Amino acid sequence: MKGPLKIGLMDSGMGGLSVLKGILKYDAELEVVYYGDLKNSPYGEKETSEILELVRDVCKRLQEENVSAILLACNTATSAAAQTLRKEFSIPIFGMEPAIKPAILQNPGKKIALLATPVTQREKKLQRLKAELGAEELILPVSCPGLAGLVDKGEFDEAEKYLRPILKKLREENVENLVLGCTHYIFLKHIILKNFPNVRIYDGNSGTIKHLLNSLQVRQRVSNRSSVSGSVYKLILNSDEELHFRLATELLQFENKF
């Protein structure tokens, strides 16, 4: 009897857990292997060539787990490495897509702030997407160096201090729409809404997950709250710190907060 489809997820740290949580909401028979490269996090301020090498190494490690496909559950990794690695690996390599398109389509002519790492902001992938949508003048790039690292350490009070002046400036500029271009930032939605209550937040997790499941021909029935997902997962964190394993468990459990 054929077993569950086995897929790999990778991220520089904790951000991709937000994608794993989304996958687990579906009543699907999947076996997910999650690899958090905490030893080398954060990726967001590194050189593109270094990120490519790191992501390549993680994908090789995931191949050793006999996965059938890999999702780079990290916008920075996707921007820096996805195009190259798709040519190098025999299994499908999927990546993240910032939810710029739905934000633009639902708010024609309105300013859209894009919170992302410096690498994601500068890479050609994002520039091509903005050009395709004719959105160069509407997208306000907001680089957030160091913010993902605060999530990896569970320092949410520090993350709020970091975000307050950014959100204040966006309010003053009458920005009403915010795209989260980093999977780490999904875990900061509650902080963003606390400091900017009326902002509309967009992220690419849902669209990416649906694309992944469609491409792999996996059924997409969302589980009821009382039901249990058919998926199982394995966490691999290349960290010796107990904090990281404890935080990963908390991030996967606190559904209402995050």
Curated annotation (Swiss-Prot):
Signal peptide: none annotated. Substrate binds at residues 11-12, 43-44, 75-76, 183-184. Keywords: Cell shape, Cell wall biogenesis/degradation, Isomerase, Peptidoglycan synthesis. Its EC number is 5.1.1.3. It comes from the Bacteria. SUPFAM superfamilies: Aspartate/glutamate racemase. Transmembrane segments: none annotated. It catalyses: L-glutamate = D-glutamate. GO terms for biological process: cell wall organization; peptidoglycan biosynthetic process; regulation of cell shape. The active site is at 74 (proton donor/acceptor), 182 (proton donor/acceptor). InterPro entries: Asp/Glu/hydantoin_racemase (IPR015942), Asp/Glu_race (IPR001920), Glu_race (IPR004391). Pfam families: Asp_Glu_race. One of its GO terms (molecular function) is glutamate racemase activity. Pathway: Cell wall biogenesis; peptidoglycan biosynthesis. Provides the (R)-glutamate required for cell wall biosynthesis. PANTHER family: GLUTAMATE RACEMASE. Belongs to the aspartate/glutamate racemases family. This is Glutamate racemase. It comes from Leptospira borgpetersenii serovar Hardjo-bovis (strain JB197).
